[in-house]
Amino acid sequence: DTKSTDFVSDWSPLHDASIHGRLLALKKLINQGSDVNLVTADHVSPLHEACLGGHAACASFLLKHGAKVNGVTVDWHTPLFSACVSGSVACLNLLLQHGANLHPPCDLASPIHEAAKRGHVECVELLTSHGVNIDHNVKHLGTPLYVACENQQVDCARKLLESGANVNSGKGLESPLHAAARSCSVELVMLLIDFGADIWAKNAESKRPMELVPPGSPLGRLFLQKEGPLSLMQLCRLCIRRCFGHKQHQKITGLLLPEELKHFLLHV
């Protein structure tokens, strides 16, 4: 297999130490003069590998010795993207402290979408707190919320909604609620409706979310129950939350309001 031979011959001891978290070996190689930014034919750096392996100590050492924080592979992967693949909050935090770009040069490898897809809630939370565009709509993926719903990552969907993600923004005409209905997730559907999802929205096939579930199923019955108008309390909550835009959770928490009212606004 020529391809695998090329891959192996392109592999350096520096990459090997980084992916496996061998800090002592990494230090020795760097001290002996190895290039911290040595890349493979695919432009994969030791920092990419350290983050992919979730090895924060190795990533920290590489960054201190001049590793490029925004290096891009031929697949458009940045170290930040690699950290979102592994779900390493420690690596993610390090990269952000060293000036990593939240938004990649190409939508083929979006960190927030990757974190949402894999269910890495803490990564989603950290990216959100640093100001990532949580409604970033990638043509072939949709929004982070849509990706979370498509992959049945309830906790990530909740975190995005709490942070002010647009509940109706999905992939083209397909809404997050359509994705939740397709996966027959009662929990996701209830969550989205609670945050004001439009149950009447039609996708490219002119189908509403409820038309994507088997009639008579628990989810089908839930949609029938929710067909009526929202209560005045729900409408007020949605209106107030919209006023705060992104980072709603932090802003509402800081309001001088009774705790019970805060809990209601926060969907606690």
How would you name each of these model-derived features?
Residues 8-9, 41-42, 74-76, 106-108, ...:
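Ankyrin repeat start-site detector
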Residues 183, 190, 195-268:
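Cullin-RING E3 adaptor/co-adaptor recruitment helices
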Residues 1-41:
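N-terminal segments that cap or nucleate solenoid repeat domains
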Residues 28-34, 60-67, 93-100, 125-133, ...:
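Ankyrin repeat domain, specifically the short helix-to-loop turn at the C-terminus of the second helix
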Residues 25, 57-58, 90-91, 122-123, ...:
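Conserved ankyrin/ankyrin-like repeat signature
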